[in-house]
């Protein structure tokens, strides 16, 4: 799994933003956003979803499986609530995640 943090070390005491790209894309689409949010005091987690960019393994087969993968990621990092910003397929993942794990999400931003 590849995660970019906008150049700032992760601190689980700060609010966290997960930036999720669309199908066939990578974390690179969020490069400027990563730096901006990190400079504003947020933890930034800009992932390459499985099967994309620098992340190993095959693509996951469904939105639900990717949502479960996201849940595992935030559990491993000890994040209690997360802000998800999703683009295209990342928006679908955010919607599914928010509907199934409402206690783990503080905000959801959808980008066409």
Where are these regions (language model features)?
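Conserved HGGG/HGGXW glycine-rich cap/lid loop of the alpha/beta-hydrolase fold
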Residues: 5-56
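Catalytic nucleophile-loop/oxyanion-hole region of alpha/beta-hydrolase
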Residues: 56-67
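Conserved hydrolase catalytic core segment
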Residues: 81-112
């Amino acid at each position: 799994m590849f995660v970019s943090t906008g150049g700032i070390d992760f601190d689980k005491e700060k609010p966290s933003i997960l930036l999720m790209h669309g199908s066939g894309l990578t974390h690179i689409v969020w490069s400027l956003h990563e730096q901006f949010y990190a400079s504003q005091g947020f933890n930034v987690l800009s992932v390459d979803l499985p099967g994309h960019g620098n992340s190993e393994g095959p693509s996951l087969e469904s939105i639900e499986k990717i949502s479960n993968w996201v849940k595992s990621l935030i559990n491993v990092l000890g994040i209690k609530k997360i802000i998800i910003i999703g683009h295209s397929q990342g928006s679908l993942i955010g919607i599914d995640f928010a509907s199934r794990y409402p206690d783990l999400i503080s905000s959801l931003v959808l980008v066409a």
